[in-house]
């Protein structure tokens, strides 16, 4: 689908979902991983074709909450029509239920549905 944001056109790929399960990217040094995940989410904002949905679960749920270094970029993606969904069980586990700052709360049924009904799952 397409949308107009300001004077720019954004295109969302209905067949792509990004899944983020940690507040860092990759294995090894966790601080480096936090820099990498921030860079990955920023890079998504610069793509010509945006994913339809970004799913956050487990430690990834922290990225959609207060004090996350990725909030500005996630809000930009949401403003361009990307659906941002965070696991409610995960927010509760980390004590972040009241700290969600972008997107909406979802459940594992919806996460499973989104992941099984698309052709492309991107997991950084």
Question: Could you say what each language-model-derived stretch is?
Answer:
Residues 41, 71-75, 112:
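Short amphipathic alpha-helical segments and helix-helix/interface helices
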Residues 98-117, 122-123:
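C-terminal structural segments of small proteins and small subunits
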Residues 46-62:
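Short, glycine-/small-residue-enriched flexible loop/hinge segments at domain edges that mediate gating
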Residues 20-23, 57-60, 87-90, 124:
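Fold-independent oxyanion-binding glycine-rich loops
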Residues 70-96:
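A glycine-rich helix N-cap at a beta->alpha junction
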Residues 17-37, 59-66:
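Short, glycine-rich nucleotide/cofactor-binding loops
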Residues 32-49:
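Histidine-anchored nucleotide/phosphate-binding helix
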Residues 1-11:
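Single conserved hydrophobic/aromatic residue that forms the stacking wall/gate
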């Amino acid at each position: 689908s397409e949308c107009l944001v300001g004077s720019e056109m954004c295109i969302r790929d209905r067949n792509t979902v990004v899944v983020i399960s940690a507040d860092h990217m990759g294995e090894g040094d966790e601080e480096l991983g936090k820099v990498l995940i921030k860079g990955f989410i920023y890079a998504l904002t610069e793509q010509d074709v945006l994913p339809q949905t970004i799913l956050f679960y487990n430690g990834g749920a922290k990225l959609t909450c207060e004090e996350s270094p990725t909030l500005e970029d996630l809000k930009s993606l949401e403003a361009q029509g990307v659906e941002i969904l965070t696991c409610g069980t995960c927010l509760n586990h980390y004590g972040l239920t009241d700290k969600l700052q972008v997107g909406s709360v979802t459940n594992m049924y919806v996460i499973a549905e989104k992941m099984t009904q698309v052709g492309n799952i991107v997991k950084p």
